[in-house]
Amino acid sequence: MLSQKINKNSTWVWDIPKKFNIGKACTDAISQDGRHDQIAMIVEDEELGTSSITYKDLSIKSSQFAELLKAQGITKQSRVLVRLPNCLDYPICFLGAMKAGYISVPTSTLLTAKEIIYLARDSGAEVLVTDIKTWENLIPMLGELEFLHTVFISGEFKKKKYKNKIKVRHLGPELEKITTFTDSVNTLANDPAYLVYTSGTTGFPKGVLHAHRALLGRKPAAEFWFNFSNSSDRILHTGKFNWTYVLGSGLMDPLYMGKTVIVHEGKNEAQGWINLIKKHKATIFIGVPTIYRQILQKSNAGRNDVKTLRHCMSAGEHLSDEVFEQWHKRFGLDIYEAVGMSEFSYYISQNANMPIRPGSAGFPQPGHDIQLLDPENLRPVGLGEEGMICVPEDDPGLFLRYWNLGDETQKYRHDGWFFTGDYARYDKDGYLWFLGRKDDIIKSFGYRVSPYEIERIYKNHQEVLDCAAIGEKIGKDKILVVLYVILRQGSKITPNQLVLYGRENLASYKAPKIVYIAETFPKTKNGKILRRQIEEAISIAKSDIR
């Protein structure tokens, strides 16, 4: 395997025990080794202020929640849906449910009531943990839920009678009633642990079921992406817990390694992140490229404002060369990117042991025997050739199956591999270059063009705030490479000038033939651009140069 030469001194041997439990591993290990008073999590809430919890209290409260669930009479592997903002009750309930052998179902606070109802119905959730506002928005639609029988309300609680058979309880007081509790359920490492939802091909979200071993499957990231130190790192994450990226890098992984996590609830403000780094002496900062870009544009902070910070990480979308270079110039720190997916979390990343090549995704982390295959014949592609990223089915980080979608699971998991649908190529030095999903790759006049290569070039233009390259069909069988651009505020550049910029900086077959100016892009709840929904109707200007 090409990438192995850069990790030749870092062989990885998996040690997956027969029995393992994520809830127990994330809450109990450090509380039993003499560091039980260490802070596990700090929440900075704009309205409620600062709150924190030690590993000892996280262990106790998550065990109390586990006992509370058992008392509801639900059976092993029943689903517990968690719909909460970033707060201390989130890890208590998310991890506590897994401690008891149930399946946690994290959901976004951005979802509408109808969307929550869909997830609750699809997952068959019997228990819901949420806040009073969300609960009252759900009440008119409860007739659609045949499985839900218990609701725990976090935070403010209004005691009143509801016209349904569902039990509604105040989470805090209910936890305090639990004074004795048993050990965590002795789950198998391969038992289901949590169920995350991602965009589906049918227009409905699809559930991705992970086993308890998934936590162990991400251990290489602790060394080769997080770059954890032997001391007590303090990780500030800018995301929300519902997202797979944040559930791993901002919750489970740091807690499993005994670190302190800092999260925020409230408005996203550039200077606010600098203030939090300084206040809590954060050593690791994790975000998406948009956050890094905002800090550079909207704050005057420099290295002296974040003296404790030593490591920065990014995922979710591609980081532009411009942001990478400006961040290094301003703060003296590199930003280490990773590529992942709901089915496999982050498994390809840049690392501190190798120079970063802007535009490259880095390397598969040790232990993950990633191969680039031709999906037609399952043969590895040659150096520099385009192949689908495929994961061996026995990789401990890989998901179990799609929830209630047997055909979908079989479509992507067969012949000993999980076929990600993402394409990439290796260069001669083992660096992996991500090309995108098969559906994203633009087939134009016999060429196959990665939208990411085009976008990387245009994001370096000082007038471009964001952009998306797609294929535009003309006639029956012709496709043009076109680019949609959102300009920086006050920019006067024209679409024609942007076409010329592409011709100067890209091979002729990659350069966009048309540039559209747009004010916004259709995006997912987590901020990813929905390329399939981009069309000329969203544009406010168009190039006419030939």
Regions found by a protein language model. Give the residues of each.
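Conserved AMP-binding/adenylate-forming core of the ANL superfamily
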Residues: 37-87, 91-95, 112-117, 172-173
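Conserved pre-ATP/AMP-binding loop-to-beta segment of ANL
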Residues: 37-39, 175-197, 204, 228-234
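Gly/Ser/Thr-rich phosphate-binding loop
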Residues: 170, 256-259, 282-287, 296-357, ...
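Conserved AMP-binding/adenylation subdomain of ANL enzymes
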Residues: 216-237, 244-283, 294, 298
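Conserved ATP/PPi-binding loop(s) of AMP-dependent carboxylate-activating enzymes
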Residues: 367, 379-411, 449
